[in-house]
């Protein structure tokens, strides 16, 4: 049976309310086999018992204008063989017909279903006759405290009375005004679109405090169910979930019991996911056996803020990624002097909160807590949301990607940013007994904030970060990250290591350099006309040992440093400590003689339009270095299968075919 068929079967069970009676806050659903199983939450008024024989035909009664004798027979079965005009007779004061009085006064369940079914024979004109208030008989059920809800359900579910959208709105308003919360719940199960009208009705109608609280609860729960449903089960399940909540059966156990009773297929995965998210509590991370004890220890240190202490500006989106969306927000705290202060923060809300996804979110939280403030933004804590939770971190001005794009970058700023970046990586690799690898270093994941004294640069998004341990070997071998920045050794099934982060850092340096030299930000390997898709462009470039072209006028020491960070052979790359030392040396060299580093627009234009001998020699030198290394190291025998271009003529011909020539 498909998910759709499953939904239809279960929805039918949810909607076919066999016996409904009113309690103070919920609607109870019972299947009644006989009179003994009927359980009422409120005591029934005493019924007048007649000693004379029961009168079964209302045609034999002489009715008074105000139906004064209806109370004498309203608890018994009705004979519908009398003249139909009789049922249209109206009370002179209220204008109520027989059916109005029936809906208002009926107190016995005996033969109730058959009596309501027999009303169909009276015809639409009779059934939908209106009183002096222009109300059909359905409105009279509001005054029936004993069986009003039951009669309303029978009239609607048996299609005895049909009400259009305007009629539903009027009935909903009347139910709210009368405080008939039970009927409001039922009407929502009939037409879930009425939910959207509750707030508007509350604004224009005078309602009791109890009713207002009920409307607020209904709206908040519906928003929660919609938010979960759209992400987990889809729109088709939202109505089913909410109906179960309204009927008071919103628990996994009750649905499973229904499945067993009706011998339905096993519960769909969508509903399993839904219940996990709906019933999720912040402390549930201790139940996730997939989380290692060392992570649990870090997570337990994180502060949990109530939602009232945090405001989230949903319209002010700071960033979006595959693992979540970051919003601007404000955290209210009390300072040492007892004054309330507002702290600008960023709030990351994970995309999904299923069990499998939560494990990854908690791992990210644990690493964030472990390196808190050392090489990443400060972690304030978490806030429990309507659905799941949000991660509260220090707010920065922008990402490095946006900073490069919107600012002029010279070599002074290049060295300032590059040094801060590589020092951050060094701190990340050394801040724990087991090294921590970021695994997704790129300009988008660097945050920049300008203070009075300095430019602060930190790493963000630790969703892929992992410790260097034996238990993480399988994870460190997986192909993860952003294509252009992924180190080439991952294609060769080599474990992610410290120097893998260095490769991604080197590619980020190239993007900085492009802005310094060309005045605009370009993606790495943009010179090569291989493919419009970044992934394929990167793969082809790496397989053929190409590197981004660096202007030849720059000092050789600087070019060698950049090339070393992006070396195809990871063992030939410098580690983070060596990168810091070499950058400091290069910065000193730059400050001593800036004329060597001046951007020569004429040379740049020539190199962008033609393949100069220096560029060809540069590529030849790099490829021959790889060739020599491969021949001397059996460990990299897999590289020998790759086609290499070693002669200068072959390199020139190859580069000419893929370089993007610009006039």
From Swiss-Prot:
Task: Please report which protein family the annotation says this sequence is part of.
Answer: Belongs to the protein kinase superfamily. Ser/Thr protein kinase family.
- Pfam families listed in its UniProt record: Pkinase (PF00069)
Alphabetized UniProt keyword annotations: ATP-binding, Kinase, Nucleotide-binding, Serine/threonine-protein kinase, Transferase
* An MF annotation (GO) of this entry: eukaryotic translation initiation factor 2alpha kinase activity
This protein is called Probable serine/threonine-protein kinase DDB_G0283301
EC number from the UniProt entry:
2.7.11.1
Q: Which superkingdom heads the taxonomic lineage of this protein's source? A: Eukaryota
EC class (word):
transferase
Q: Quickly give the catalysed reaction.
A: L-seryl-[protein] + ATP = O-phospho-L-seryl-[protein] + ADP + H(+); L-threonyl-[protein] + ATP = O-phospho-L-threonyl-[protein] + ADP + H(+)
- Kindly identify the residues recorded as the active site: 440 (proton acceptor)
What are the GO BP annotations of this UniProt entry?
Answer: regulation of translational initiation
Q: Which cellular component appears as one GO term in the record?
A: cytoplasm
Q: Taxonomic classification, please?
A: Eukaryota, Amoebozoa, Evosea, Eumycetozoa, Dictyostelia
UniProt cross-references to SUPFAM superfamilies, sorted A to Z: Protein kinase-like (PK-like)
């Amino acid at each position: 049976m498909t998910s759709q068929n499953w939904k239809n079967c279960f929805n039918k069970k949810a909607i076919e309310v066999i016996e409904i009676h009113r309690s103070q806050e919920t609607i109870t659903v019972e299947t009644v086999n006989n009179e003994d199983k009927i359980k009422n939450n409120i005591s029934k008024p005493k019924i007048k018992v007649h000693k004379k024989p029961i009168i079964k035909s209302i045609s034999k009664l002489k009715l008074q204008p105000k139906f004064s004798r209806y109370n004498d027979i309203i608890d018994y079965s009705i004979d519908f063989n009398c003249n139909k005009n009789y049922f249209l007779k109206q009370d002179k004061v209220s204008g109520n017909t027989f059916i109005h009085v029936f809906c208002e006064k009926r107190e016995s369940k005996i033969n109730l279903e058959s009596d309501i079914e027999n009303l169909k024979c009276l015809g639409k004109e009779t059934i939908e006759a209106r009183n002096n208030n222009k109300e059909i008989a359905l409105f009279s059920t509001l005054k029936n405290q004993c069986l009003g809800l039951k009669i309303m359900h029978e009239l609607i579910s048996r299609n005895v009375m049909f009400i259009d959208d305007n009629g539903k709105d009027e009935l909903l308003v009347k139910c709210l005004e009368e405080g008939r919360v039970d009927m409001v719940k039922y009407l929502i199960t009939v037409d879930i679109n009425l939910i959207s009208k509750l707030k508007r009705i509350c604004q224009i109608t005078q309602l009791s405090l109890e009713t207002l609280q009920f409307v607020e609860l209904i709206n908040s729960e519906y928003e929660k169910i919609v938010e979960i449903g759209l992400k987990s089960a889809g729109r088709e399940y939202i109505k089913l979930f909410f109906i179960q909540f309204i009927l008071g059966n919103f628990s996994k156990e009750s649905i499973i019991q229904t499945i067993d009773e009706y011998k339905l297929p096993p519960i769909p995965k969508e509903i399993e996911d839904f219940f996990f998210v709906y019933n999720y509590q912040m402390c549930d991370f201790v139940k996730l056996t997939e989380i290692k004890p060392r992570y649990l220890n870090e997570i337990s240190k994180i502060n949990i803020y109530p939602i009232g202490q945090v405001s989230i500006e949903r319209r002010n989106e700071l960033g979006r990624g595959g693992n979540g969306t970051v919003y601007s927000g404000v955290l209210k705290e009390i300072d040492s002097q007892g004054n309330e202060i507002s702290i600008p923060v960023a709030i990351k809300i994970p995309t999904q909160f299923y069990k499998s996804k939560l494990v990854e979110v908690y791992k990210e939280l644990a690493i964030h807590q472990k390196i808190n403030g050392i090489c990443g933004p400060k972690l304030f804590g978490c806030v429990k949301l309507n659905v799941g939770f949000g991660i509260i971190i220090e707010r920065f001005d922008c990402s490095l990607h946006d900073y490069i794009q919107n600012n002029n970058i010279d070599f002074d700023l290049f060295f300032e940013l590059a040094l801060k970046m590589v020092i951050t990586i060094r701190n990340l690799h050394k801040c724990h007994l087991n090294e921590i690898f970021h695994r997704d270093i790129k300009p988008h994941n660097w945050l920049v904030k300008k203070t009075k004294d300095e430019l602060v640069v930190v790493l963000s998004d630790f969703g892929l970060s992992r410790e260097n341990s034996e238990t993480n070997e399988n994870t460190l071998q997986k192909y993860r990250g952003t294509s252009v920045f992924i180190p080439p050794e991952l294609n060769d099934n080599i474990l992610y290591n410290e120097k893998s982060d260095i490769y991604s850092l080197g590619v980020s340096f190239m993007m900085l350099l492009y802005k310094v030299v060309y005045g605009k930000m370009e993606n790495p390997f943009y010179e090569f006309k291989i493919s419009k898709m970044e992934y394929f462009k990167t793969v082809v470039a790496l397989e053929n040992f190409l590197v981004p072209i660096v202007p030849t006028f720059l000092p050789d020491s600087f070019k060698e440093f950049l090339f070393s960070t992006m070396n195809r052979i990871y063992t030939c790359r410098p580690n983070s400590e060596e990168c810091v030392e070499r950058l400091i040396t290069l910065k000193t060299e730059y400050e001593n003689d800036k004329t060597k580093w001046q951007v020569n627009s004429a040379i740049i234009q020539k190199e962008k339009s033609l393949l100069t001998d220096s560029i060809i020699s540069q590529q030849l030198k790099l490829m021959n270095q790889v060739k020599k290394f491969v021949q001397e190291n059996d460990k990299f025998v897999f590289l020998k299968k790759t086609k290499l271009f070693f002669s200068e003529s072959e390199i020139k011909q190859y580069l000419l075919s893929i370089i993007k020539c610009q006039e």
